[in-house]
Curated annotation (Swiss-Prot):
Gene Ontology cellular component list: mitochondrion
Designated name of the protein: Uncharacterized protein T05G5.5
Single GO term (MF): ATP binding
Positions bound to ATP: 18-25
NCBIfam families per the UniProt record, alphabetical: dephospho-CoA kinase (TIGR00152)
Source organism per UniProt: Caenorhabditis elegans
PROSITE patterns: DPCK (PS51219)
Alphabetized HAMAP family for the sequence: Dephospho_CoA_kinase (MF_00376)
Disulfide bond annotation, renumbered to this chain: none
Protein family (similarity comment): Belongs to the CoaE family.
């Protein structure tokens, strides 16, 4: 990881990922309830494709008017586009190529803002932590997982979709076992929600004890001068 030069970032920046329906949102909500700032990639992804943005215009040119609801301000029809990209790897690649640079840049701006305000550490909540290469500049990574059958059942219930659609969306992402191998912290969510919350609280307690974020404050001036240069090169590559 090219940010390993600045080892305090190992604990200052925490990457949170998981499967499509493994409980990542619940984990994120526990962090937020404990006052930890969250940079939510899904939320940012919605911001960068609002009508009128350059990313929106590129998507409309790439996928056509049928994926946009002109009766409601021209907003992106996410469900319809989702069905396309989860069944078509080439279209998924095209979507990612258009949206990911804009998402990375917006997340980085939020990251710098939070650093300036003096937060202890930050959580990047992103389902594509490893697929998008975000783990290259995030030291501490957390993956929340559950068994495949549980994930399918949760998706069918939550999203009101067929089992086939649920399985297709799960298989479109990196295998959860591979994510677990790459993660520094793995949270098992095969139990109930109260058990999950207790596990997250334990992780938060571990992070709170870290001394690295405080060292980062001393090195912040140097980092602020160097990191944007390399990160800008990365997101534009």
């Amino acid at each position: 990881m090219w940010l390993d030069w600045f080892f305090p970032i190992e604990m200052l920046v925490v990457g949170l990922s998981g499967g499509v329906a493994t409980g990542k949102s619940t984990v994120s909500s526990v962090f937020r309830a404990h006052g930890v700032p969250i940079i939510d990639a899904d939320q940012v992804a919605r911001q960068v494709v609002v009508p009128g943005t350059s990313t929106y215009n590129r998507l409309r040119k790439e996928f056509g008017d049928e994926y946009f609801d002109d009766e409601h301000g021209g907003v992106l029809r996410r469900d319809k586009l989702g069905k396309l990209i989860f069944s078509n790897p080439e279209k998924r690649k095209a979507l990612n190529g258009i949206t990911h640079p804009a998402i990375r840049w917006e997340m980085f701006k939020q990251f710098l803002t939070l650093l300036i305000t003096g937060t202890k550490y930050i959580v990047f909540d992103t389902p594509l932590l490893f697929e998008s290469g975000y783990d290259k500049w995030i030291g501490t990574t957390i993956v929340v997982w559950c068994d495949f059958e549980q994930e399918v059942e949760r998706m069918v219930t939550r999203d009101n979709i067929s089992r086939a659609d649920a399985e297709s969306r799960i298989h479109a992402q990196m295998d959860i076992e591979e994510k677990k191998k790459r993660a520094k912290i793995v949270i098992d969510n095969n139990g109930n929600i109260d058990e999950l919350r207790e596990k997250v609280k334990h992780v938060i307690a571990q992070l709170d004890k870290s001394w690295k974020p405080y060292i980062f404050r001393v090195a912040f001036g140097i980092i602020l001068g160097v990191v944007p240069y390399y990160f800008f090169k990365y997101i534009r590559s």
